[in-house]
């Protein structure tokens, strides 16, 4: 955070990712929000009420002009750096916090951005205390030494699979849960075809499919991913799904890494405990 930005604690805030609202919610700062993108996707009741009462502008999409920001009443911005817009150049006097939480490889690193938001908003003590609680809970669930089983995690778009590199968010989270992540080589995610996926699955004990299916709570692998149904009919695997459209994986989970860790830990130990973010899929086995 730029030194000059920190001197001014914004009372009215604009955000360019619905993800960032969860950091504000953790600090009870939703009432500072005067503008957001994709308001129709929000499940935060305070922010939705502000939008209904015309206290918060809903831009609905990310194509926001500097003129729209200027008339929103925002005194500070949580920006989305990969969009490529330098809001500081448009508003030199306005505090801007570029949010790079998505680049963090450690689950606690993503949660720790709460401290940056707290400092930006003048809530340093509160944010540090909140993060320490998250960190302590995470560390209490951590498995000290990674072991079997081997886990393949693939994001499925409906036409192709994407796999994260060996050093990534998933590798850290699964190692802390007692598993071994099977990632791709290099430092960037790669797209896999069906043959590459099957080759990977032959090495795995557990398959976790991450997808985005709005309104879909039916966890049948043969429906979610028909291309692999024949494979799972003849190859016994433990299969789980993570439907990010329904479970808040890119929202509340940022500040619940301890819950993610505990659920994966239970998943790898074949526990039948309830899970918020991961569901066992029904295969033909």
Regions of interest found by a model, annotated:
Residues 3, 9-12, 23, 54-60, ...:
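Second-shell loop/turn segments in exported
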Residues 20, 29, 36-47, 85-88, ...:
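Extracytoplasmic ligand-binding site segments that recognize negatively charged/polar headgroups
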Residues 170-190, 208-211, 239-243:
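His/Asp/Glu-enriched short active-site or ligand-binding loop at hydrolase and phosphoryl-transfer sites
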């Amino acid at each position: 955070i730029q030194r000059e930005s920190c001197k001014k604690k914004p009372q009215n805030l604009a955000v360019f990712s619905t993800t960032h609202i969860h950091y504000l919610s953790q600090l009870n700062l939703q009432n500072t929000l005067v503008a957001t993108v994709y308001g129709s996707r929000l499940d935060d009741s305070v922010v939705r009420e502000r939008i209904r009462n015309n206290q918060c502008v809903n831009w609905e999409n990310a194509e926001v002009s500097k003129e729209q920001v200027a008339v929103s009443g925002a005194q500070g911005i949580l920006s989305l750096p990969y969009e490529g817009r330098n809001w500081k150049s448009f508003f030199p006097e306005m505090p801007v916090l570029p949010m790079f939480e998505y680049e963090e490889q450690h689950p606690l690193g993503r949660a720790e951005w709460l401290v940056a938001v707290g400092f930006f908003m003048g809530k340093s003590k509160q944010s540090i205390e909140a993060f320490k609680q998250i960190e302590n809970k995470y560390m209490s669930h951590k498995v000290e030494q990674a072991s079997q089983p081997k886990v393949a995690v693939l994001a499925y778009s409906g036409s192709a699979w994407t796999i994260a590199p060996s050093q990534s968010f998933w590798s850290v989270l699964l190692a802390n849960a007692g598993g071994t992540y099977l990632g791709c080589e290099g430092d960037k995610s790669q797209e896999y075809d069906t043959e590459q996926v099957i080759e990977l699955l032959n090495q795995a004990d557990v398959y976790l499919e991450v997808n985005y299916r709005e309104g879909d709570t039916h966890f049948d692998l043969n429906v979610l991913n028909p291309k692999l149904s024949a494979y799972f009919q003849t190859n016994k695997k433990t299969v789980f799904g993570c439907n990010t459209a329904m479970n808040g994986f890119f929202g509340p989970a940022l500040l619940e890494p301890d819950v993610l860790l505990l659920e994966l830990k239970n998943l790898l130990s074949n526990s039948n405990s309830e899970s918020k973010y991961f569901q066992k899929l029904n295969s033909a086995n």
